[in-house]
A protein has these predicted regions:
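Acidic, metal/ion-coordinating pockets
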Residues: 1-177
Length: 177
């Protein structure tokens, strides 16, 4: 067991709502209950979190006991998701300010059901601004919790200065040493 001063982030890159008979039968409530016990520091919204529309995602967000983030996901006025999640979090870890920022694939409107009040800003454009905003707040360690896929993660790594680590999802690409 890790001590209380362990400098560890527990992150989820999204897509908890897909691929199992369990989710198909029971939806987000039991999923939230189960993963609340894991102790995540943050979770990215994946495209499949929108599979049953914004209302089911809202139920999950309300049940979650950890921050759910997605910075380039833009919510229009009148949506039940308005102001329900942030683009990033800042954690104090061993006296260091660590930022965790998240983006979601811009084609989510085609791969899922986000509804007409949800749109997706270009990942690189959003991240350049978010990294600067985090750095302006004294953050010098930035983790990207990404749900855009391995190829896009590599492009982001080349195009956005200031990101130290990318924890990526979406493409389900196995990386080994």
């Amino acid at each position: 067991e890790l001590g209380p001063n362990a400098n560890i982030l527990v992150l989820d890159a999204g897509d908890e709502f897909q691929g199992s008979l369990f989710y198909t039968q029971y939806k987000s409530g039991p999923v939230a209950e189960f993963i609340n016990g894991i102790g995540f520091d943050a979770m990215a919204i994946g495209n499949h979190e929108f599979d049953d529309g914004p209302a089911e995602l809202l139920k999950f967000i309300n049940a979650a006991k950890f921050p759910i983030i997605s910075g380039n996901t833009k919510i229009a006025d009148g949506s039940e998701l308005k102001d329900k999640f942030k683009g990033y979090i800042i954690k104090d870890m061993g006296g260091q300010k660590v930022g965790v920022v998240s983006v979601l694939a811009t084609d989510t409107g085609e791969t899922s059901s986000p509804g007409d009040k949800v749109s997706f800003e270009d990942e690189v454009a959003y991240l350049k601004g978010a990294v600067k905003e985090l750095q302006d707040q004294g953050v010098n360690k930035i983790v990207l919790l990404s749900h855009v896929g391995y190829v896009r993660d590599q492009e982001i790594a080349r195009e956005v200065d200031g990101i130290d680590v990318i924890v990526g999802g979406h493409s389900h690409t196995l990386l080994s040493s």
